[in-house]
């Protein structure tokens, strides 16, 4: 399903920016059907796939099995995980679904261990209001400088927010639109 929105190069960009190692515990926020989870599970010791939708999690379980992936139902703005409990946080197309993206980033920073890494991709700002109804989008993307500010506000270091070469494509009434995406990465101080 997700391949119709964006390509494998988005997954590769997020996973490369996250610098996952074989000893890492990775949290995939807004894991959905496992777009990033699958790639992270090939590298990491353990992956926690968090999504608010039981249906998405069930689809991911059917596709990936359980193996070294732990599936959890939950809200990214209020995660039921201990402080400093994961080495890496990854996410794709999650921030624009939450009312308080700054709170979501604060939670991601909270659960990261000192020295841990975060890498998330999402939509840049756009004006396609119909996505609010068709895809349950709360935000119509973000300005990259706003994402940079949210990450710095949460005391993350080495923050980078760059435009991805890939776009998110969606169709309404036979009109295909391409929305630019960004990749944000950072590190929690030691």
Predicted regions and their residues:
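Glycine-rich helix-loop-beta junction characteristic of Rossmann-like nucleotide cofactor-binding loops
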Residues: 15-21, 79-80
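C-terminal alpha-helical "lid/dimerization" subdomain adjacent to the S-adenosyl-L-methionine
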Residues: 119-174, 178, 183
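A short acidic, Gly/Pro-enriched loop at the edge of an enzyme's catalytic core
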Residues: 77-88
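A short SAM/SAH-binding and catalytic strip from SAM-dependent methyltransferases
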Residues: 87-100
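C-terminal lobe and adjacent flexible extensions of AdoMet/dcAdoMet transferase-like proteins
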Residues: 184-190
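Conserved SAM-binding loop and adjacent beta-strand
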Residues: 1-13
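A short glycine-rich, Lys/Arg-flanked "PGG" loop and its adjoining helix->strand segment in the class I
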Residues: 102-117
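Class I SAM-dependent methyltransferase SAM/SAH-binding core
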Residues: 27-78
């Amino acid at each position: 399903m997700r391949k119709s929105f964006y390509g494998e190069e988005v997954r590769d960009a997020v996973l490369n920016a996250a610098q996952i190692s074989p000893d890492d515990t990775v949290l995939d926020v807004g894991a959905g059907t496992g777009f990033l989870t699958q790639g992270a599970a090939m590298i990491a010791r353990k992956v926690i796939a968090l999504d608010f939708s039981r249906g998405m999690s069930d689809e991911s379980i059917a596709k990936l099995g359980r193996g070294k992936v732990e599936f959890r139902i939950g809200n990214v703005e209020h995660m039921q995980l201990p402080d400093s409990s994961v080495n890496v946080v990854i996410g794709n197309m999650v921030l624009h679904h939450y009312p308080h993206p700054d709170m979501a980033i604060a939670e991601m920073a909270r659960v990261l261990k000192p020295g841990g890494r975060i890498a998330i991709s999402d939509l840049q700002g756009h004006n396609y209001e119909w996505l609010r109804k068709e895809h349950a989008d709360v935000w119509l993307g973000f300005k990259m400088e706003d994402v940079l500010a949210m990450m710095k506000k949460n005391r993350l270091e080495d923050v980078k927010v760059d435009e991805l070469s890939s776009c998110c494509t969606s169709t309404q009434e036979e009109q295909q639109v391409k929305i630019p995406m960004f990749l944000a990465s950072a590190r929690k101080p030691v």
